[in-house]
A protein has these predicted regions:
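Conserved PLP-binding active-site segment in aminotransferase class I/II-type PLP enzymes
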Residues: 1-11
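PLP-dependent class I/II
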Residues: 3, 16-32, 38-52, 82-380
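Short, surface-exposed alpha-helical recognition segments that flank or form part
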Residues: 9-10, 63-66, 176, 289-292
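A glycine-/small-polar-enriched, mobile loop at the entrance of the PLP active site in fold-type I
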Residues: 33-40, 54-73, 82
Length: 380
């Protein structure tokens, strides 16, 4: 059967291929410690599934695309606590079925297919920026990131700015864990506005950090959030990867366009999932508790790489360690053969070659076991 040519050209999702190889090893009986996919092993805080169960109705009804008012209010309250910003829950917030689908579908609301409009993002990058852009009919424009893996307005050429319709930033950054300063966010946002481009800030990991809390574009965009979208998720903050719950916050006109798009596709999280998200966004302590666990894992693994003289680059926030190893494919295969699954940096696009990414998803105990394998394999 013939496939959409875009789908045929891009092949499988990069990390899915790694998972297939790992699955084959598991089926052969090999024990694996898996750092490849950002799906933490810590239990979801008990009050969250309780809220979900309490909200399951006896009669099923379609959810509204705009989402429950209670959820939009809970998200606005969280943003006020976290960033000191005032967001209108009625016009500036829309829930999504996780941030991934929101990120993928956003270009469909703003791109004119085949018109040569550019979607700009730093590379290496979360693969969904590229994939959503291509399926929406945009021209992709990956910008090579410098040594600190932070995208800055000055990194983007005038030619790229001229054709840009959508500009992505990601902070804390996937795959590297770098953090973009508010000053750099201001520069990106102001240039995007001056060029007539929509600025989209992926902030899904903003509550996963070691010391200094990362900022948000919402703090610098002004009360109307003109030309701005920010993307949030319950997945890592609250251990809700399987619930599929996120949100887009931003410019009321852009949110309205997204509601129209999403209504056409029936993209709305179930209301019992939204009820669980209300509980999650209303509580900050569980996010702080999880942060302690991720910091402990990061420390254990960083020491292992330091022991064998391999630099951990950036990696002060988000869920990832980004390690310079030389031949990322060879190292990935070597570790896989020894029972440790990591992601080769090139899976995240140009600029990822020579690095591996480790997601802080195994338990702390598993991380400690993995250290011995890492040291033995990488010290050779």
């Amino acid at each position: 059967m013939e496939r959409n040519p875009i789908l045929a050209a891009m092949g499988g999702y990069p990390l899915a291929e790694i998972q297939m190889r790992a699955r084959d090893l598991r089926e052969a009986g090999a024990p694996l410690i898996d750092f490849s996919i950002g799906d933490p092993r810590e239990p979801t805080p008990a009050f969250i599934p309780e809220a979900l169960k309490d909200a399951v109705p006896s009669i099923s009804q379609y959810p509204t695309t705009a989402g429950l008012p209670e959820l939009r209010t809970a998200i606005a309250d969280y943003l006020r606590r976290r960033f000191g910003v005032s967001i209108d829950p009625a016009t500036q917030i829309i829930p999504t079925a996780g941030s991934k689908e929101g990120i993928f579908h956003t270009p469909f609301a703003f791109i004119e297919p085949g018109a040569g409009q550019g979607v700009v993002y730093g590379s290496p990058a979360y693969p969904v920026y590229e994939r959503g852009a291509l399926f929406a009919g945009a021209e992709i424009d990956p910008i090579p990131l410098s040594g600190d893996f932070v995208l800055r307005a000055s990194d983007i050429s005038d030619r790229s700015w001229e054709r840009a319709r959508l500009v992505w930033s990601c902070s804390p950054h996937n795959p590297t864990g770098s953090v973009t300063s508010n000053e750099d966010l201001v520069d990106l946002l102001e240039r995007s506005r001056s060029e007539g481009a929509l600025f989209a800030s992926d902030e899904c990991y903003v509550d996963v950090y070691e010391e200094d809390p990362p900022g948000s574009v919402l703090q610098v965009a002004g009360p109307d959030l003109a030309g701005t979208l920010a993307f949030y998720s319950c997945s890592k903050r609250s251990g809700m990867t399987g619930y599929r719950s996120g949100a887009i916050i931003g410019d009321a006109e852009a949110i309205s366009a997204l509601i129209d798009l999403r209504a056409s596709a029936g993209l709305a999280p179930p209301e019992f999932v939204q009820a669980a998200a209300v509980a999650a966004w209303s509580d900050d302590q569980h996010a702080a508790d999880r942060r302690v666990i991720f910091t402990a894992k990061r420390s254990v693994l960083r020491k292992a790489f330091e022991q064998v003289g391999l630099p951990v680059v950036a990696s002060t926030a988000a869920l990832y360690l980004w390690v310079a190893v030389g031949d990322d494919v060879a190292v990935t295969i070597k570790l896989l053969e020894q029972g440790v699954v990591v992601s080769p940096g090139r899976a995240f696009g140009p600029g990822g070659e020579g690095y591996i990414r480790l997601a802080l998803v195994p338990t702390l105990e598993e991380c400690e076991v993995a250290v011995d394998v890492l040291v033995e394999c990488l010290d050779e």
